Amino acid sequence: MQFDDFANHVITIEAESADLEITSLVSKLLTTAGNMDDKTLSTVVRFIKGTVFPAWSSQTLDIGPALLHTTIAQAAGPNVDSADVENRLAEYGEIGAVAASYDLNGQQGLSAFTPSTPDSLTVGHVDKTLRAVASASGDGSESRRRNLLFGLFSQASSSEARVLARLILGEMRIGVGTGTVRDAIISGFIEPAADADKKTLESREDAKSVPPASQPEITNKISGDTSPNTSESVQTKKSDPDTSSNVDPSAVVERALQVSNDYGMVATIARNQGQAGLIDISLELGRPIQAMLAQAADGVDAVDTWDAVAIETKFDGARVQIHTDGESVSLYSRNMEDVTDPLPEIVEFISQKVTVPAILDAEVVAVSDDGDPLAFQEVLRRFRRKYDIDAMRESVNLNVYVFDCLHIDDADLLDIPLRERREKLRELFNTTDALSPFQLTTDPNVIAQARSKALSNGHEGVMLKDPDSTYNPGSRGQHWLKHKPDVETLDLVVTGAEWGEGRRANVFGTFVVSARTTADEQQFNSLGKVATGLTDDQLTTLTEQLRPHVRSEDGQTVMIEPAIVVEVGYEEIQRSPTYDSGFALRFPRVVGIRHDKAISDVDSLSRIKHLTTGESPD
């Protein structure tokens, strides 16, 4: 597929605002690419989402704005420098428009940098080149990366340059999210195949005499129903195409995406094998999936909702997904970054304890020499360490607590109940020492006692889980609840913002929130950025209220005069050098816009310190 064709599809999608029409246009793009080889289709799916690599891959381009600006300037000609690119960025507001504003196509001397460059850009060549950019390392790697990018931009038309620049920074800005791509796969490949199957069935002379196909195993696999024979549900089964055609296609595609964590792969299988092929996708060692997530819970209402409640300790640690083939071990963070090398003691522990292929969900916790839990930041010190790992290992001790299993000994376990997964976990380790504490109860008092014990031991609280629930990757439903102490909200003032993307390109999508430096001053220090908690309508309203207070703009970033107060919830306040207050909010969210409060009512840093350290406020 010519990259120019892809770019024109992207620009057409960008001009559309209606969600259904955007899905239709993406579907048209996929079916166009679908007439080509598997690799091209897979690449187009990733590109339309603004990524070069599958979601499960920890590989990144790692191209910052500065290098991109320099490369665009180089491709634009000798009279253009990066300062000119940055000036245009301030004028146009986004890098794609800046790249499109230059006459890049036709630069000479390409053969010195990319001797295998085709006469025109193709999707495959762009993908191959960007992968080479990501792989460049060692002495001279930055120069090689710049030359490779220069080779692409030097051949790019205006539309190609617009899309290429956005793709490199992972900012497509066209309103295409994961749900859009999922629905486009359904409408492009699943529904047409289902219609064709239906017509074939209707054309049979004996169609009326054919009884409905039985499909218990497929329904169980897609719906997560665990009431029938669950021992069969973990076995490897091939789907009957006639049966699978009766399953909700949305559920089939969603489940395939959860298990594979690869949109390109799912699109290719949907085209080639239909629903039956998607149903047969299974977990794979070395291909991490999204973690199942929990919602915050204010009380013990779960007792009234579930038949029983599973209680686990809520650690103040970092989530890891453990993959082992019974010998070698790989560790992945919640963001699917490979963290195997920084955590050698966890690798050693799992290697000793687990001798069969397995995928496990666990929490890594930093502990003192006495075994007491340390703050979350200490764990991050280990995760981020690339050098002198042995020295850091001596400095920060780690424990691992395994609390779930997704795959054991060639069997996927996502669709069996939590209580059964925990039993398999106990059998796998043949001990409870490595496992997160686990107990079942129907008594609210037991939950309260467990939470009190966890808090007194220095942990965050408890997790409450439905013992009959299946494991839904990437889902934040009502089956896992975080039961922690109530945290007060903060009244903070908006002092900056960033423009949104896609459908939210004309409103602020992220806000910098700040506290007063002292209780009697009108000076402010930032505590972080918040991007959740507001509806589209609320974002529009808040943007209009903030516009008169804009001090300056620099590309996507806006400086704002302190005027509008927002109520912000959070999970924790941490010390951080990132913001000038010296603190940062963990998982902040806007609870509401406080029009009833003036900036003099904004919380002070002394209160922040009090909430963090217990020091008396001024």
Curated annotation (Swiss-Prot):
Cofactors (names): Mg(2+)
Keyword terms of this UniProt record: ATP-binding, Cell cycle, Cell division, DNA damage, DNA recombination, DNA repair, DNA replication, Ligase, Magnesium, Metal-binding, Nucleotide-binding
Residues at the active site: 314 (n6-amp-lysine intermediate)
UniProt feature, compositional bias: Basic and acidic residues: 197-208
Chain residue ranges for the region called Disordered: 197-250, 459-480
Tagged with keyword Cell division: yes
Compositional bias annotation for Polar residues: 216-234
GO biological process, one term: DNA biosynthetic process
Enzyme Commission number(s): 6.5.1.1
Catalysis performed (reactions): ATP + (deoxyribonucleotide)n-3'-hydroxyl + 5'-phospho-(deoxyribonucleotide)m = (deoxyribonucleotide)n+m + AMP + diphosphate
Keyword Cell membrane: no
MF GO annotations: ATP binding; DNA binding; DNA ligase (ATP) activity; metal ion binding
Residues bound to ATP: 312, 319, 334, 363, 403, 476, 482
Pfam family of the protein (one): DNA_ligase_A_N
Alphabetical list of HAMAP family matching this protein: DNA_ligase
Function noted in UniProt: DNA ligase that seals nicks in double-stranded DNA during DNA replication, DNA recombination and DNA repair.
Protein family (similarity comment): Belongs to the ATP-dependent DNA ligase family.
Name of the featured protein: DNA ligase 2
